Amino acid sequence: MDFAGHLHLRAAPRAFGHTALTLQSFRAPFHLSKPYWDYDSRVLLVQVVNPTAGILAGDRIESEITVDAGAALLITTPSASRVFRMDAGVATCRQHFTVAAGAWLEVMPGPLVPHRGSDYRQSTIVELTRGAGGFFVDQLMPGRAAHGEAWAWRRLCLEFECRLDGRLLVRERVDQSGEELRALAELAGSGAAACFANAILIPGAEADEDWRAAVEGLHRDGAWVGVSALREAGWSIKVIAPDGAYLRETLRAIRAVLAEAFPRMRCDPRRL
């Protein structure tokens, strides 16, 4: 059975500066946990759960998330998203995030795990008004490496676009077979189980950049970490790690550094 699932959320400020979901609509394969308000970071944490086995051929899933001025929202998932083998067909995911001035949105799902023969295409568009902030992360694992199944998907297409006041900040696109992406991992010397992460940080307000040196200092044997400035505002952070555990620890270390400069990131995405 294939799904045409959707997730529609809107977050807005409420009494005492709390953030609440003023709109929530979802259909399989999406389900929401009970939101958690983090008093320290002043962020509403929402965990999106996929109660099905994973993503199958023919699935079409769509997310629309809006954060109003003065609200702060963290979206996460409890586990990896698995894209299963497809003898034919394709699965698609479209994501659209809108963040108003004075709002904050962090999207940090678990890693994407494409299985042998899968064909998955994901498009993400982020639209921010000046003064909005956010942190947007994508993680990719090479497949079921523990089962000897790595870099075996048929096609993987990941598109990401971020705009500030309508002006393009960054547009990225990966469209490769497993074998083609394996070559990049080998170039980095990260081995057959290499994992990738791509993060976009939009500060939203003036902040010192002492964090940059600390994040770049996480580049070491076993993990490649790079930081580059976007054309007008914000930063791109890229990570290549030798395995999933190393990637997870590196991302945790990056968030710990950033939380010192951006208090909204003090919310633990694994709190639920």
From Swiss-Prot:
GO cellular-component term (any): cytoplasm
InterPro entries: UreD
Any one Pfam family match given in the protein's UniProt record, by short name: UreD
Compartment(s) of residence: Cytoplasm
Disulfide feature: none
UniProt-recorded Gene Ontology molecular function terms: nickel cation binding
Location (main, coarse): cytoplasm
PANTHER family per record: UREASE ACCESSORY PROTEIN D
Family indicated by similarity: Belongs to the UreD family.
Functional note: Required for maturation of urease via the functional incorporation of the urease nickel metallocenter.
Subunit (UniProt): UreD, UreF and UreG form a complex that acts as a GTP-hydrolysis-dependent molecular chaperone, activating the urease apoprotein by helping to assemble the nickel containing metallocenter of UreC. The UreE protein probably delivers the nickel.
HAMAP family, per database record: UreD
Protein name, as recorded: Urease accessory protein UreD
Source species of the chain: Opitutus terrae (strain DSM 11246 / JCM 15787 / PB90-1)
Name of the gene: ureD
